[in-house]
């Protein structure tokens, strides 16, 4: 199943808000790293994250890329990108060691 996130009420959100999510089963002693596109359009890496992982980002004007990539050695990962209205705009539900969601 595609990952789901529960964004706060959209009335207070910028239309440029995106929600990144990574779900799955993290194996004992495995490390899950996540790379996502930040507000300026640059990649940011978070190391050894807990699952489920979510991040809210308000993209600067002109930033078009919405991306989250999760990697591991053994874990089974899925990812998703939701827009400000909470709609899933891209998802990967492959339960694999790498999950890529880019729009």
Model-identified regions with their sequence ranges:
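A short, amphipathic beta-strand motif
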Residues: 16-24
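Residues at beta-strand starts and edge strands
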Residues: 14-16, 51, 75
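N-terminal low-complexity, Pro/Thr-rich disordered segments
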Residues: 1-17
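Mature extracytoplasmic domains of secretory-pathway proteins
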Residues: 23-72
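Extracytosolic low-complexity repeat regions of secreted or lipid-anchored proteins
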Residues: 54-103
């Amino acid at each position: 199943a595609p990952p789901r996130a529960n964004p706060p009420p959209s009335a207070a959100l910028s239309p440029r808000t995106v929600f990144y999510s990574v779900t799955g089963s993290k194996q004992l002693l495995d490390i899950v790293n996540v790379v996502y596109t930040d507000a300026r359009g640059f990649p940011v890496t978070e190391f050894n994250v807990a699952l489920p992982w979510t991040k809210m980002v308000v993209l600067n004007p002109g930033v078009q890329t919405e991306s989250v990539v999760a990697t591991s050695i053994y874990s089974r990962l899925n990812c998703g990108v939701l827009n400000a209205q909470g709609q899933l705009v891209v998802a990967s539900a492959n339960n694999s060691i790498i999950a890529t969601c880019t729009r």
